A protein has these predicted regions:
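Long, contiguous binding/interaction regions
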Residues: 1-89
């Protein structure tokens, strides 16, 4: 069960160049305690990749990761925070 101040989020990461992959992986390894799931798909027709992450953490932690990803050259990141329908009692 989630603690009160923790959220679940999904981040979509569009990686436009192979040179950007190392920076993305290095950054994600620093936030590995937040990652619940990861899936990567190559888009060869665009010479790019799409990574989706399922995360659990505080709003500050999740926002910091998303912001840092978006500052990497050749990387676009979008975050979606999920709302719990049944909050803990």
């Amino acid at each position: 069960m989630l603690e009160e101040n923790r959220r679940v989020a999904v981040i979509a990461i569009w990686v436009e160049t192979r040179e950007s992959v190392e920076g993305v992986n290095r950054l994600l390894s620093g936030y590995q305690e937040l990652v619940r799931g990861r899936m990567g798909l190559p888009f060869r027709e665009f010479s790019a990749s799409l990574i989706s992450l399922i995360l659990e953490g505080t709003t500050d932690q999740l926002g910091a990761l998303s912001g840092k990803l978006g500052m990497l050259p050749g990387v676009t990141a979008k975050i979606l925070f999920l709302t719990r329908q049944n909050p803990p009692r």
